[in-house]
Amino acid sequence: MTASILQQSVVDADFRAALLENPAAFGASAAALPTPVEAQDQASLDFWTKDIAATEAFACRQSCSFGPFTFVCDGNTK
């Protein structure tokens, strides 16, 4: 079993499930697999990528700037 198969079986739940269904197809044994990492919580991921980004990063779509720095956010671009 290659190192890349071991690594993917640790981080990819779908790949791990396929490997456990038929380990011989991958030249592996189920007993040799390391413990997988915890699966990503989709609600937490959505919070950090959609909710926070929508309210914080994109709250000011236009800005006033002076040189390289934005110092006022009033909704108009100057």
From Swiss-Prot:
Sites of (3R)-3-hydroxyaspartate modification: D74
InterPro entries listed in its UniProt record: Cinnamycin_RiPP, Dur/DurB-like
Claim: Transferase is one of the keywords in the record: no
Molecular-function annotations in GO: signaling receptor binding
Keyword Transit peptide: no
Cross-link (Beta-methyllanthionine (Cys-Thr)): C60-T77, C64-T70
The entry's keywords: Antibiotic, Antimicrobial, Bacteriocin, Hydroxylation, Lantibiotic, Thioether bond
Pro-piece positions: 1-59
GO BP annotations listed: defense response to bacterium; killing of cells of another organism
A Pfam family hit: DurB-like
Crosslinked residue numbers (Lanthionine (Ser-Cys)): S63-C73
Post-translational modification remark: Maturation of lantibiotics involves the enzymatic conversion of Thr, and Ser into dehydrated AA and the formation of thioether bonds with cysteine or the formation of dialkylamine bonds with lysine. This is followed by membrane translocation and cleavage of the modified precursor.
Cross-link Lysinoalanine (Ser-Lys) mapped to chain: S65-K78
Family from the record: Belongs to the type B lantibiotic family.
Function: Can act as inhibitor of the enzyme phospholipase A2, and of the angiotensin-converting enzyme. Shows inhibitory activities against herpes simplex virus and immunopotentiating activities. Its antimicrobial activities are not very pronounced.
Protein name (record): Lantibiotic cinnamycin
Species per Swiss-Prot/TrEMBL record: Streptomyces griseoverticillatus
Recorded name of the encoding gene: cinA
